[in-house]
Each structure stands twice: as C-alpha cells, then as structure tokens.
Amino acid sequence: QGKETAIFTGDTLFIGDVGRPDLAIKADLTERDLAGLMFESLRNKIMPLPDDVIVYPAHGAGSACGKKMSKETFDTLGNQKKTNYALQAVTKEQFIDQLLDGIMPAPQYFAKNAKLNKEGYGSFDLVLETGVVPLAPKDLEEMVNV
C-alpha cells in the first residue's frame, strides 16, 4: 500500500545508539569523515520516515559496536527520535564530537571478521567437517595450560 512500516537498519541505527564510524575506515576517509556520513544518513534517510516505523537493527547490546546499545531488539522510530542521543537536534560537528567521544578501541577480532564478511568462507558442511575435532582430555588440558 506504499506505507513505510519497518526499517532494517543494520549497524547504522541501533536501539539507543548508532554504529561506530571507526570500524570501516578506508584509506581516503577518516573516522570523522565517516561520522559525518553517518550524520547525513541518519538525517536524510532514516529520520524523515514516519514515527510509527518499527526499527529493526542488526543486533543489540553485548557487542562493541556501540556505546549505549539497548537490550531491546526493536522500537519505533518516534521513540528513538526522543530517546537516542544520536538522533537529537545537534549540528553535524556536535554529532561527530559526541559519536567519537569515548569510543573504545576496535575489538581484536574485528579485522578477521571483516575480512571473512567481505571475502566469504567455506560451506557450513566444510566448517563442521574440519572444525569439529574430538579432543582427548589430556590434549585439552595441554591447550589450556599453554
């Protein structure tokens, strides 16, 4: 019927937060540049949607992808406009400063995960075949005590 009802926001908009601009740094873009692009995406693409649109982010709390991510898995855009610090009325420069303030270093595993996401990996059957190997208790003990 042409009415927007939901948006899948990936790692751009979380419940209570937005994504990290430092995890996708390219050679020609700084984290400030990427934070500015985040501001533009939020203001020009997401925030103009109706307040009753349901926001479904890629994931919630428990990851290092945001500073104030909620445990909730969905919310209305209208409520996020009221409660999410990143959707408040601030200038682009203020937004960038807020977003970059207090960001923790990227998790150690991030580069490997990003490479896997970009390049792909073997089939699930192959992962099971090569990754599920029984260990004798002695072998496990040696691995733990290294």
Locate predicted features:
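Metallo-beta-lactamase
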Residues: Q1-Q108
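Flexible, polar/low-complexity N-terminal or interdomain linker segments that lie immediately upstream
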Residues: K82-T83, L87-V146
